Design a protein with these regions (language model features):
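A short acidic (Asp/Glu
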Residues: 22-25, 37
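Long, charged low-complexity segments
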Residues: 29-127
């Protein structure tokens, strides 16, 4: 994929991931600022280890990957920042040196969404 293809979709996907994790953190009584997905997720894991592990397992069960969850998370941690400022030569160089595999973010966002949906829409488990 060329770095400029589907930039809006990639930025929105990364931003959704950030907002969903921040929502989980907020529901756990923690406020956090910043765009680094890895930092946000690790903060959530320290508070809700079991739920975070379930989400990670859900993500990995949907991916065929040669990398661990942590490696993929680390690789995609700055996607929002890098793609949002794509016109910046430094960001473009970063994207070229570290190409995105968007399937991880797609699956991660969906898994977090499912977790939030269970907590917010159907907290008692009855659908």
């Amino acid at each position: 994929m060329r770095p400029y293809q589907n930039v809006a979709g990639i930025v929105n996907l990364a931003f959704a991931c950030e907002l969903f994790i921040k929502c989980l953190l907020n529901m756990s009584g923690i406020e956090h600022k910043g765009h680094k997905i890895e930092k946000l997720w690790n903060e959530y894991k320290t508070v809700c280890e079991n739920e975070a592990s379930e989400i990670e397992a859900s993500v990995m069960s949907r991916l065929v990957a040669d990398f661990t969850f942590g490696e993929m998370l680390h690789n995609d941690s700055d996607v929002f920042y890098n793609y949002r400022y794509l016109y910046d030569p430094e960001r473009l160089a970063e994207i070229r040196n570290n190409p995105l595999k968007p399937q991880f973010l797609r699956v991660f966002v969906f898994a977090i969404y499912q977790s939030l949906n269970e907590k917010l829409i159907c907290p008692d488990g009855i659908v």
